[in-house]
Amino acid sequence: MRAIDLKMQELNKKFKADIIQQGTDIIEVDKIPFSSPMANYMTYGGVPVGKITEFFGGEGGGKTTSALDICANAQIKFEEAYDKKVAQLQNEIGLLEVKDTKEAKKKIPKLQQQLKEIEEKGPKLVLYVDTEQTLDTQWAQLLGVDTDKMILVRPQEQTAEQVLQIILELISTGNVGLCVLDSIPCLVPQQIFEESMEKKAYGGISQPLRIFCSKILPHLTVNQCAFIGINQIREDLSSMYSTISTPGGKGWKHACSLRIRFRKDTLLDMNNKELSSRAENPAGNRVGMEIVKTKVCKVLIMSKSYRQYTQVIHLSPEYFHFYIVLLFLDIY
């Protein structure tokens, strides 16, 4: 055996994990889908599990609505995965009981213990951190979110460091399959929390968020948890051109595997016909999505989904346009 092989075994034994290995397996990144077919097409299936995703954009762009849509689909996905696993174990136990051999009798207690642990743990949960204090539970329910099964964190006088530590500890339990932080700019670091309004602070949320990203990424991978951070946009006053920036610093941007910009697009009436920007009572609007950064799929062109204020996400016209896009790509 080579010296490197012995050293690899020694280090893996020392750290009690197979963190060093020769060769790599192709790891399929699981996704939590949007309800929008165009959004799923752009992101190759939705929000990646085990990664950090950022939704950012101006007010009314559809960031929170899209995040809640992901929450609803995540709950369905987690329930289905739980039911499938339980049914699989029950089926295995049943087959072994029918065999009635010594080897089967040895395996049954282990499988029963495994089944008991899974049933006690239950399906994975959605964690929603409402730092803005603006979550409308009725709107969330209209989007399909089961708010009774969702863990809601509403910080009162906690600093950014304390809120981020709460998130870290909850995800490390392994029971959380999706975490939504709404939103990053509302986190107040300890340094700013203790100072008066007149005193100017530098750095802001960047430093605690950078440390948080370094700590949370391994937990997201091990516990198979997706993380969505909702962010706002700011005008960059230091530039002579009309440019925008987002709070959180460069460390946050580097940690994100997927960054999606949301824009409020054309206003619509009840028949999904376009209205002027000055219309007083629109029934909904198109939501523009742009993939700004991705490590999990190819960057595609911008897409638009349909949102009605009474029927939430209106899919009928979107399916039609999605078919047209696929037909166009097939021709060319």
What does each model-identified segment do?
Residues 149-157:
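A glycine-rich helix N-cap at a beta->alpha junction
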Residues 130-132, 183, 230-234:
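A short beta-strand-to-loop transition that corresponds to the Sensor-1 phosphate-sensing loop
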Residues 118, 157-222:
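Phosphate-binding/switch loop-helix module in NTP-utilizing enzymes
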Residues 1-149, 168, 172:
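The Walker A/P-loop phosphate-binding site
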Residues 135, 187-188, 236:
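Catalytic P-loop NTPase motifs of RecA-like helicase/translocase cores
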Residues 1-21, 85-88, 94, 99-101, ...:
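C-terminal regions of RecA-like/P-loop NTPase motor modules
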Residues 170, 202-320:
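Phosphate-binding/switch region of NTP-binding enzymes
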